[in-house]
Amino acid sequence: MAVFLEAKDAHSVLKRFPRANEFLEELRQGTIERECMEEICSYEEVKEVFENKEKTMEFWKGYPNAVYSVRDPSQSSDAMYVVVPLLGVALLIVIALFIIWRCQLQKATRHHPSYAQNRYLASRAGHTLPRVMVYRGTVHSQGEPSGHREAANSPQVVLGPSRGGRTTVRLESTLYLPELSLSRLSSTTPPPSYEEVTAPQESSSEEASVSYSDPPPKYEEIVAANPGADK
């Protein structure tokens, strides 16, 4: 449905009502206070108008419609002087605790060897070769029978279990040297030197007189030379 009005009726509907300062409305510059009172301003808008931090903070502190509060930059710098030393002290405490823990760990490992070292020592002890123990036994008296002496002088082999599932063989025997043999060993002449052994030997006079080209002696000659051989 279209509605058409005459000019007089149309002006009565689309009429503009001017303000109280009708003539000075366009000449008078608006202030930030009036604009922020009529509307809700943000901190960035106030900062663009004043272009000064001190004036901006002064207006913002007294502004009733402030949506959020803005901290003073000087207060944040003061807080840094408190936070930084606290962080440094906390870091030093953590480093000290780590050093103490490392020292305690090293002491514990020195007193108690590791599992790998224990296995190495156990395997090394299990693969050791059997030992042959030779000791000097007591000298028996002359009145003992020869059977006991032979039993005492004969070696004894003892078998026993060992580590690693193997058997150890222990040879027990009594080794001693009589005094007579010691005296004989001390009175014997030393062996000849290398020069004496390698020196050319001189042939004796008997060997020189015997001629190997002569025929062997006969049986009668041998019997005549040794008459007591037949007896």
From Swiss-Prot:
Transmembrane segments: 79-101
SUPFAM superfamilies the record matches: GLA-domain
Ranges per topology, Cytoplasmic: 102-231
Residue numbers carrying 4-carboxyglutamate: 22, 25-26, 33, 35, 38-39, 44-45, 48, 51, 54, 58
PROSITE patterns, alphabetized: GLA_1 (PS00011), GLA_2 (PS50998)
Region Disordered: start-end pairs: 140-165, 182-231
Ranges of biased composition (kind: Low complexity): 202-213
PTM: Gla residues are produced after subsequent post-translational modifications of glutamate by a vitamin K-dependent gamma-carboxylase.
Gene Ontology biological process terms, A to Z: blood coagulation
GO-annotated cellular components: extracellular space; membrane
Keyword Mitochondrion attached: no
Alphabetic keyword roster: Disulfide bond, Gamma-carboxyglutamic acid, Membrane, Transmembrane, Transmembrane helix
Topological type in the membrane: Single-pass type I membrane protein
GO MF annotation terms: calcium ion binding; serine-type endopeptidase activity
Stretches of the chain found on the membrane's Extracellular side: 20-78
Disulfide bond annotation, renumbered to this chain: 36-41
InterPro entries per record: Coagulation_fac-like_Gla_dom, GLA-like_dom_SF, GLA_domain, Peptidase_S1_coag_factors
Positions of the propeptide removed during maturation: 1-19
UniProt domain Gla: residue ranges: 20-65
Cellular compartment(s): Membrane
Tissue expression summary: Expressed in brain, lung, kidney and heart.
Protein name stated in the entry: Transmembrane gamma-carboxyglutamic acid protein 3
Originating organism: Homo sapiens
